[in-house]
């Protein structure tokens, strides 16, 4: 969320964000009570963090269950399907797998196994399993950048700035971000890209 909002700002958009955190301090694993998120509204004349979303990124069944009602009909859902096993999606109150039972037919669904894809992207970088798994968000971000028709290079430069002292982590994040972007491109989606209008910003000095 932070990289997306920073990218939006750098290409000339107004940005409003709203991070939210689990409803419980130590909620049961893979339950709705444990869901956190980061909402971004970007474009011209942005006044609030937004209402219903055009793109929803979900990393697990609980995230989908908690947020699906916040997505517009016809919105694009970007979902990591690696945890959509029966025992896990039932914890999120789904009676069947929502990715395959037709219940999401009113949305544009992009479902992929983020975990396996990032492992492949990082296989030659010598990173431990936990570090590789942490790059999953960057795969989702790459897809979102493509859907919003954003310049990939802007986000890559942000990564270089943040992780310049950690070259292995930097290379992993860059590789996974590119993989997500080109994954979406290769799908040849019958989905219109979202055009985000740039804000008219007065001349002056600004700090991010």
Task: Place the predicted regions along the sequence by residue.
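Active-site cofactor/cluster-binding pocket
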Residues: 1-208
